Amino acid sequence: MARAMNRLGVRPGLSRSDFKLVASGGFGDGCNSYTHSMAWFRNRLYVTTMRNNFALMRARLSIGLHSWPVETPADPFELDMRAEIWAYDPLEDTWNRVFKAPMIIGSHGKPIARDISFRSITVFQSPGDPHPCLYVGTWCPARGPGPLILRSEDGIHFEPTCEPGLVGLPVTTIRALVPFKGRMYTTPAGSRGGNTNVSGHAVIYESRDPAHGGWEPVSDFGFGDVENKSLHEICAFGDHLYVGTLNNNGFQLWRSTCTGPAPYEWEPILERGAWRGPLNQIALSLTPFKGALYIGTGIQGGGIDKQNDIGPGAAELMRVYPDKTWDLLVGTPRETPHGFKEPLSGRGPGFDKVFNGYFWRMCEHDGWLYMGTFEWSSVLAYVKRSKFTGAFGRVLGYVGPKNVLDYQSGFDLYRTQDGENWAPVTTNGMGNPYNMGLRTLESTPYGMFIGTANPWGPNIMPLDGDEFVFNPRGGCEVFFAPSTAQNR
């Protein structure tokens, strides 16, 4: 039976019981770690994957673990690193893998995956396109030629539209693809040194016809600030294109109408992490909702940036209005140049949960704003105890790592109608503690899809074991909830 609106004309929000699991175990391959992006195209849901995330982390990061949680070779590229694109037909309840990245010869003379992830996907119609097409931003290995933007007219055949590195830039990934005013905008990111977020070229690029390349820079490098290590996230809101940065002194938020001669005029809206400083290192997610732009923050590395000695710190949420005024919604009360700000929700960083290192993705659906987190407590059991001192170490020793994994771990998903009152949908990764993050949300005519980041596969080291075993709950997952008008 249809789920009726209440007397105020408000459609009820989704609850945990509304969601069903439609893909598990990394689409049958635990090496598929992240659902890195989603798009609705031709009555199907398209989901892109990133593979073997823990293997890549082991190769470039030292994070003080007494044993590595996932079985990985010394060289991650001994694994099949080729990213995939999957399509889901909700009427037939069927998945099909429509694309898998090809192998190429890397700069070291050996075969490697051309694409280890597809970090962005969107629907756009270029002037020469016969109809709206899929555009996909890739992530290439450091030994590859550079990232590409792929295009597909039919959702099956994907072809490059630009030279490697967009225009030959020294970057490794295309992080965002955003249509605005009939043009496409992107942010090249990543560097050859292995830093996936810091950009070798922190500039916004624009194309009026991305089917044929035509990319041109439309901003100064880092908006004129060398501390803006990447232009991390882009979002169209009203008459402006907004850009959030990664800055070790705290993110900045900029906007432009993208009119007049390039490079366009850009104006600053927020700085120094909305005056929280380094603990708001990145403007990680930007989403319009009911007349304001919502901003979720984070610290790279899931809430602890070992390279820059930032964190641990939990994420904050704020909103900015077109007149440049802003509210703190979830976070730490503080003085700012715009007066004293306290969280209107009454909740501290991370919704009072220190492990929520990212407010990673947001999505409006049926009049509600949904926000998912990255929650890192599942790693605690593998961290050397000497890393934890003081009260936190004592509490962890008392509770025990297995209890943390069983009862604490897994991403959170919250929803709100006004930005101030939030209700939890799940606080345990939809019942799977290995679902560390909610990486993607997509509102569709049929309902809402969510996709997870779950790098705990295929084989893991059990907390009480001494050899790797298969993890049936490892690998990314996708859940679906019908629109509330269709529920019950």
Name what the model sees in each region:
Residues 44-48, 133-137, 183-187, 240-244, ...:
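Conserved beta-propeller blade signature
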Residues 126-127:
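Calcium-coordinating acidic loop motifs
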